[in-house]
């Protein structure tokens, strides 16, 4: 029986496949090969060079002072490059390859893998997880990356596999060559196509979810990551926030780090955001919702304060006169007197 080799491009995807294989959710002779590096970020000009990739990560991490602890380090990256190439070289002509992708990171990883395999005569299938919608009762779920798939649903996505023919293979390799020639540090999927874009591509999204009053940095990061159709690393968004602070579009308060740091949009940031009318509309809608939420919170807060004052006044009613009670509780004399009518005191 032919062996099926699933090639994926994120740690979360690898975890799902390993679990599915070890628990026999995936039947038959199946394996998983995993590539770690996120080739959608950083320079790939003139090809993938591990030392250049490491240099870029070192620079990126050094500049990104308030980046959280990452899931892997440089040693992990080096080891995975070696492991990945070693496992790819062992692929046999009788093996069937499933290349899984959905996000720009996975798309770039897939192109890199296809470039490595281009001189081999292999049976290759592509699986774009965005092509499958999982329905359960009245809920529909569409994964944006392979890492979002639960092990139990892998077979459903695999059913949408399509065989890679020679013409498409050539087109994908040509696309990879064009991307490598671009002097860009960011690649995203736009209208289903992988493209090089400017490094400030996500700046509008960041500003769109940054309020005019100071708010925890994590809230903005979460909104950008959660509401964007394009999957991007939190490290990259952190770095862009730093750049927006440098250019005066965002102001920060507190120590320059993730935990505890607060940010708000500046007038310069609003001018920049206004260049995108749809983004500005979303920012204004969010601001209105925030004001309404704050109004509700203030209402309940005032109700709580009033209850505390009334409770105190009740306790003092038998020992102090109305004027003194009013002074001590902050209630008016009329409110103190009305306690007798409302509460029978």
What are these regions (language model features)?
Residues 1-71:
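A structured, charge-rich N-terminal accessory region that forms the first stable segment of a protein
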Residues 222-234:
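Short helix-coil junctions and helix-kink-helix linkers
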Residues 245-256:
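A short, conserved structural fragment
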Residues 267-292:
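Short, amphipathic alpha-helical interaction segments positioned at domain boundaries
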Residues 287, 291-345:
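Elongated, amphipathic alpha-helical interaction scaffolds
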């Amino acid at each position: 029986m032919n062996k099926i080799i699933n090639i994926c491009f994120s740690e979360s995807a690898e975890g799902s496949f390993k679990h599915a294989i070890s628990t026999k959710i995936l039947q038959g002779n199946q394996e998983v090969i995993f590539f770690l590096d996120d080739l959608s970020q950083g320079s790939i000009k003139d090809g993938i060079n591990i030392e250049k990739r490491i240099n870029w990560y070192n620079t990126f991490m050094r500049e990104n002072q308030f980046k959280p602890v990452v899931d892997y380090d440089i040693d992990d990256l080096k080891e995975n490059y070696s492991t990945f190439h070693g496992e790819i070289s062992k692929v046999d002509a009788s093996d069937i390859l499933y290349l899984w992708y959905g996000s720009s990171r996975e798309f770039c990883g897939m192109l890199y893998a296809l470039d490595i395999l281009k001189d081999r005569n292999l049976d290759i299938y592509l699986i774009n997880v965005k092509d499958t919608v999982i329905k359960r009762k009245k809920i529909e779920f569409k994964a944006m990356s392979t890492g979002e798939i639960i092990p139990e649903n892998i077979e459903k996505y695999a059913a949408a596999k399509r065989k890679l023919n020679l013409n498409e293979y050539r087109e994908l390799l040509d696309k990879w060559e064009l991307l490598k020639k671009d002097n860009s540090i960011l690649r995203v999927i736009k209208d289903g196509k992988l493209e090089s874009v400017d490094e400030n591509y996500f700046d509008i999204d960041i500003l769109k979810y940054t309020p005019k009053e100071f708010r925890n940095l994590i809230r903005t990061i979460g909104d950008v990551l959660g509401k964007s159709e394009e999957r991007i690393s939190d490290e990259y968004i952190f770095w862009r926030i730093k750049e927006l602070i440098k250019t005066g579009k965002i102001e920060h308060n507190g120590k320059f780090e993730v935990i505890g740091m607060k940010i708000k949009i500046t007038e310069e940031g609003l001018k920049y955001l206004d260049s995108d009318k749809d983004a500005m509309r979303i920012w204004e809608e969010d601001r209105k919702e925030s004001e309404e939420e704050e109004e509700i919170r203030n209402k309940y807060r005032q109700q709580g304060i009033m209850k505390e004052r009334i409770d105190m006044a009740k306790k003092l009613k038998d020992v102090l006169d109305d004027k003194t009670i009013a002074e001590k509780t902050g209630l008016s004399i009329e409110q103190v007197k009305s306690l007798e009518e409302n509460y029978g005191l």
